[in-house]
Amino acid sequence: MAIPVPVGLRPGGSVLSAPPRRAGSVRRTTTMDFTWPDGLAGDTVLDGRGRDLRTNGDGTATVLVEASLAMVTDPRRIIKEIGSIPNLPTLRSLAGESAMPGYRRRLAATPAAAAAGTPLYQLLDDVPGATLVSGAAWQRWYDMDRYLELKADVRHRIMTDVCTGYQHGSSALQPDGTLRWSQDRQPAVDIDAVDDDLAWHRHARPEGVTMRRARRIDVWVAGPVIHVDAFFQDSSTLPAGGRQSIHEYTLTAEADRGTGTVRTLTPVPRVLPYHECPLAVSNVAALAGLPLSELRGAVLERLRGPLGCTHLNDMMRALADVPDLAQHLPPASGS
């Protein structure tokens, strides 16, 4: 059985990662590349990078800030090593703790929380969600039975109502609530497949089995409206070459320039693993009228469990940084 999904919500496939940069705009890009030097049973190495870039009214570009995050986690997803540029020595307090359950609470309790609104904090905040999906990179490199043997803890986990795609009655689930593991994958349009050397920051390009989370947020102002155009892609390498897209969304939004409140929020599913996943888009109206700056917390409160997609939620939570990005727009952008 499957839950009906309106035709207009069904994913349309992977797309170009970025439009031409708009004069008078600010663009944030981040990437998180995961590798496993000693194989699936070994440590996971994260190379995270980010940049804020302003495109001035005359089309020239100014790098506002760059950041990087390095992390090593063990097979239990416990943080073994962590470091960043700019250097935040207090991050070392996260070593020995989980990169998933409780991570964001512990991060918020450190002085690193003062970096909120920056590319570095975006990378730090993204650790649990990106870590959660990273192991999916291996599914095309192993026979599925062998993969599930190695991931026995995941195979037997009850997933009912964890998210929209796993809601009760979803075709993603076995009758006992475990996953069917019949997932849709689509060829990924590489994020660098755009005719602009400055479209993205310089990111890692590891070989072999890798997973990448890539994000882009473009911000500009026209009259009384803040405009947002965003992109989100989880992708992994394939044994035969190229990449597959695992989760991919685009999104546009408008907010009031004076108050920062959300006027419109329109996510578009591009690639998702299960038939019911796109239904999460129908629930984003719950965020209308909220200040952008409150989205990081409000998304988790209003779109939890079967009301939301974990990855779309992460995409929308990042819009809390739009007011900070808008502060760096060139003066002419609103004229």
List the predicted regions and their residue ranges.
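Active-site- and interface-proximal helix/loop "cap" or "latch" segments in soluble metabolic
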Residues: A2-D190, S236-S335
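Long, positively charged binding patches that form subdomain-scale interaction surfaces
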Residues: G169-S245
